[in-house]
A protein has these predicted regions:
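A structural signal for the main folded, soluble domain(s) of proteins
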Residues: 5, 9, 238-242, 247
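Generic beta-strand structural signal
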Residues: 5, 38, 106-107, 203-205, ...
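A short, polar/proline- and glycine-enriched secondary-structure boundary/capping micro-motif
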Residues: 16, 123-126, 242-247
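Active-site glycine-centered loops adjacent to acidic/histidine catalytic or metal-binding residues
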Residues: 8, 41, 80, 116, ...
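Residue-level marker for buried hydrophobic side chains located in beta-strands
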Residues: 3-5, 36-38, 113, 194
Length: 247
């Protein structure tokens, strides 16, 4: 079984280079997988599935995943901090299964926990406060009640607030907290954690024969994680002469 993990593509930002990487990935790499896991922030912003009717680019993204699913690859999509309002209609258009915020999968000898990763950044108190509001059922009802033109205005406001917060917050504050990592892994009884969000791709070997894989974004680091035949490997994308890092 070959499983591929990606996150933080931030599609829809009118970034032609990233869009081209996505198209090539879906054509040349994704069909080789039995399972494809998208662990959040597939889209740069998404404020409700009602946008599908008006967003031709979002529909084209869904079509790529639907084609992949028809060819036999199981597609799983998790919500991120940018596209937290993805819901059943979007997943259905992709031919995908919408994952809960915390998902456990078995990969050979590994019991792995899949997250987007922003919930691990507990040192960033202001962000976690905003996250609780934005992920609440009340905000979902509010967001889904807005007409499309007001959703676009809200999206712009949220992006500006996010950029201002990042500019004024130390990088270490916005990274995953080691205690939060230990707690969530212990709570689920897993030996492997896979997540994105931080844009700091890495493989961390933890105590007790545990490990943590942080996925790359697609604006700076361009890569994906593969599990196959009992081993993990990080592959650069687009492919280069660099050999994949494996364990």
């Amino acid at each position: 079984m070959r499983a591929i993990f990606i996150s933080d593509l931030h599609l829809g930002e009118q970034d032609e280079a990233t869009e081209a990487r996505f198209e090539a990935f879906m054509r040349d790499v994704a069909p080789q997988a039995n399972r494809l896991y998208v662990l959040g922030d597939l889209l740069h912003v998404w404020l409700g599935d009602a946008l599908l009717a008006r967003d031709a680019y979002a529909r084209s993204i869904c079509a790529r995943f639907a084609e992949l699913a028809l060819r036999g690859t199981k597609v799983f999509i998790a919500r991120g901090n940018r596209d937290f309002m993805i819901a059943a209609a979007f997943a259905k258009a992709c031919g995908a299964e919408l994952l809960p915020s915390e998902t456990i999968v078995t990969l050979g000898r590994h019991r792995a926990l899949l997250l987007h990763g922003d919930e691990l950044c507990t040192d960033d108190v202001a962000y976690q406060r905003a996250r609780r509001v934005l992920r609440s059922a009340a905000f979902r009802v509010f967001g889904n009640s807005l007409p499309v033109f007001l959703r676009a205005a809200l999206a712009r406001r949220l992006r500006r607030a996010s950029e201002a917060h990042k500019a004024g917050t130390a990088l270490n504050i916005m990274d995953a907290n080691v205690d939060a990592i230990a707690k969530v892994m212990a709570r689920h009884g897993v030996d492997c954690l896979i997540h994105g969000h931080t844009h700091r791709p890495a493989h961390h070997v933890l105590s007790g024969a545990r490990e943590r894989w942080v996925l790359s974004d697609w604006q700076q680091d361009y890569g994906y994680l593969v599990w196959e035949e009992g081993h993990f490997a990080v592959h650069p994308w687009p492919a280069s002469t660099t050999q994949p890092a494996s364990l």
